[in-house]
Amino acid sequence: HCISSAASDVYKRQIWRAPTDNDRNVRHEWERCGYDRAYARAYDVQTRTVVSSGIGEAALGVDGGAYGEETAVEDAEGPMAVNAVEIKCSMGAVAPTVQPIARMDTTWTVHADGSVALHMNVRKDPAFPFLPRFGIHMQLLKSMSNVTYCGLGPNESYVDKRRASWHGVFSASVSQMGEREIKPQENGNHHDCSWARVQGDGVALMIVQGDGSQPESPAELLRGFDFQALEYTAAEMTRARHDFELQPSGFTEVSVDYMQSGIGSNSCGPELLPQYRLDAPEFDFAITLRPQLA
C-alpha cells in the first residue's frame, strides 16, 4: 500500500523533465518530438509463473523489515522464490504524430516476498534528439515523506554536476530534497545511487539497483541510478513560471532513472557535451522495488 490508489499517475515510464534554463534551446527539439507528451504503449504482453532467484534483504545487501512473509526454498544457487510471476511486455515510448521514440522489452518479476524486479532493454530511435531522462515515476503516499539514499549527496547531483557532492548515505524529508528555484525547473536529482528508501506512516518502499540476475559485465554491476523525491511533478514545474505558482501534487513524487542528461551551460555557452547526453542507441535498466514495514 505504498503507492497511492488515488493518484492519477501511479506508475509510468518517463523521458520528460522540467526544462532547466540551460535546456532553453534543446527544449524546442524535445517538444517538437513530443517528449513532453510521451507515454508507454504496449504491443504484446505475456505472463507465466516461474521459479527464480529470491530478492531478499541478504541478496540486496540492505536492511529492512519484509512486507509479508518470504516463501522460499534452498538450492545450490541460494534462496529461490516459489511461484514468482513474470510479466514480459513489448512496448514503445510514443507520442502523437511521430514514430516510436524508443522500443522497450520489459520484464517484471513479482516475487513471493512482495518485491518486484524490473528489467528493461531500451532501443532509442537515432532520428530523435538525446533524451532528457529515462526511467520510471511513481506517486507514493504523501505521508511517505522521509527519504534515505545511498549515492551522491547531500546536494543535488547530475552526471556533469557533482563536484559539491560525495558518495554516502543521506537522509532528508521530501520538502528538503528539492532546490527552490525562482523559475521552476528540473532540480533535486541524486546521481549514482545504489539504493534509496522512502518511508512514513508505518510503510516503506526500498529501491535497489539491479534485478537480482547476474550482470553481463562489471560495468553493469556497478552502475547506479538517478533518484529524486519531490513535492511537485515535472509537468507542474514545466507549467509554472514562478516559484510561488507551484502547486504541490499531494503525493510524494519519486523518480528512478537509468540516467538524466547533464545540466550543461547552454543558456550562454556551448551545447551539452556528448558524453553527458542520454543518447545511447541501446541500454539496459534494472532495479528492484521492495515494500517494507517501517
Please give the residue ranges for each predicted region.
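Beta-strand/loop-rich accessory regions of lumenal/periplasmic or secreted enzymes
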Residues: 4-294
